[in-house]
Design a protein with these regions (language model features):
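Polytopic transmembrane helical bundles with strong interfacial aromatic enrichment
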Residues: 1-314
C-alpha cells in the first residue's frame, strides 16, 4: 500500500471546500424554499448580461446561489490540481478529478433547470447531484487527514449483516431518502414515500448504534460518528414533521412564509449532514472492522460425509 505524505494545509483546504459546499447546499435550499428558481430567467447570463443584477426579491437567492456555485467550482478545481501535484495516492487524485467533473455536471443541470422552466426530473437530479458532490468533498477532507489509513488493526465482526454491510446499506438508504425528499419538495411525489423512507433510515441508524455500542464500545472512531448520526437523525425527524405541518398551515399563502422557508431549508441542510455522517460511519467501519469470515461449510461426497472447516495447523 502506497503511503501518503500528510500535508496539513491541503487537509485544511479540503475541509474549507467541504464547508463551502455545505453553504452551497443551503443556498440552493433557500432558492427552492422561496420559489425563486426562475427569478433569473436565463442562464449562464443573468437578464442577458454577466453584470451583477439588482439583488432584490428572489433574484438575491437565485443569483446568490449561482455566485456561490461559481466560487465552489473554482475552489474544487484548485483542490483537484493540488491533489494531483502533491498526493501520491492515485485513487485520491482521481477522486479530486471526479469532484471537478461532478460540479460541472451539476452546473449544467442547474442551467437546464432554469432554461426548461423547472422540470421535475431535472430539478430532482440537480438536488441529488448536490448531495453526491458534497459527499465527494467530505471524502476528500477525510482522506487528506493525518490519521486516515485502511490498514488499521481491525476488530473481528462475525455478525450478519456485518457492520460494513449495515453502514453501507444505511448510507444508500439515506441517499434514496434525500432523492425522495427532493421529489416531494419539487411536487413530483407525495408524502407517503418520504415517510416510508424515514422509517427505513431510522431503523438502519438505530441498528448501527446498537451494533456499535454493543460490540465496539471502546472504539471512538466508531462510537462518535454513530452518536452524531442518531442525534442528527432525531433533529431531522423533528424538522420533517415541523416543516410538513407548517406547509399544510400555509398552503393558501400567496408566497412562502418565513417560518416555512427557515424550517424547510434547515431540514435540507440537516439531511445533507445525515448523509455525510452515515458515509463517514461506513468509511470508519471499513477502516476499523473486518468484513467477517464465512463459517465452516459442509460438503458431501459420494462416500461418508466429510466436514470441511477452515484451514489450520495440526
Amino acid at each position: 500500500m502506497t503511503r501518503k505524505r500528510y500535508n496539513p494545509w491541503l487537509h485544511r483546504y479540503a475541509i474549507f471546500v467541504a464547508a463551502a459546499t455545505f453553504l452551497l447546499i443551503v443556498a440552493g435550499a433557500l432558492v427552492t424554499s422561496n420559489d425563486a428558481g426562475l427569478s433569473v430567467p436565463d442562464w449562464p447570463t443573468s437578464f442577458g448580461t454577466f453584470r451583477m443584477p439588482r439583488m432584490v426579491g428572489g433574484v438575491k437567492f437565485e443569483h446568490g446561489h449561482r455566485m456561490i456555485a461559481g466560487l465552489v467550482a473554482i475552489l474544487t478545481t484548485i483542490l483537484a490540481i493540488w491533489l494531483w501535484r502533491s498526493d501520491c495516492r492515485r485513487w485520491v487524485r482521481r477522486l479530486g478529478a471526479l469532484s471537478v467533473l461532478t460540479i460541472l455536471i451539476q452546473a449544467a443541470l442547474g442551467g437546464i433547470t432554469v432554461l426548461f422552466y423547472l422540470p421535475i426530473t431535472i430539478s430532482v437530479s440537480h438536488a441529488c447531484m448536490a448531495q453526491i458532490f458534497f459527499s465527494l468533498a467530505v471524502c476528500l477532507a477525510f482522506f487528506t487527514g493525518e490519521k486516515w489509513k485502511l490498514d488499521e488493526p481491525k476488530s473481528a465482526d462475525r455478525a450478519s449483516p456485518s457492520l460494513r454491510q449495515l453502514t453501507a446499506g444505511t448510507t444508500a438508504l439515506v441517499f434514496l431518502q434525500l432523492m425522495v425528499g427532493a421529489g416531494f419538495r419539487h411536487n413530483g411525489l407525495g408524502i407517503v414515500p418520504h415517510l416510508a423512507g424515514a422509517i427505513l433510515v431510522t431503523a438502519g441508524a438505530i441498528s448501527i448504534v446498537m451494533r456499535v455500542f454493543s460490540q465496539f464500545p471502546g472504539e471512538p472512531g466508531l462510537t462518535r460518528p454513530a452518536l452524531v448520526l442518531i442525534i442528527l437523525l432525531l433533529i431531522q425527524l423533528g424538522l420533517g414533521i415541523g416543516s410538513y405541518i407548517l406547509k399544510l398551515a400555509a398552503r393558501s399563502a400567496p408566497q412562502p412564509l418565513p417560518p416555512v422557508v427557515e424550517v424547510t431549508t434547515i431540514h435540507v441542510a440537516i439531511g445533507a449532514l445525515v448523509l455525510v455522517t452515515s458515509l463517514v460511519m461506513a468509511l470508519q467501519a471499513f477502516r476499523f472492522v473486518d468484513g467477517g469470515a464465512p463459517l465452516p461449510v459442509a460438503k458431501e461426497s459420494a462416500g461418508p460425509r466429510v466436514i470441511v472447516g477452515s484451514v489450520g495447523s495440526t
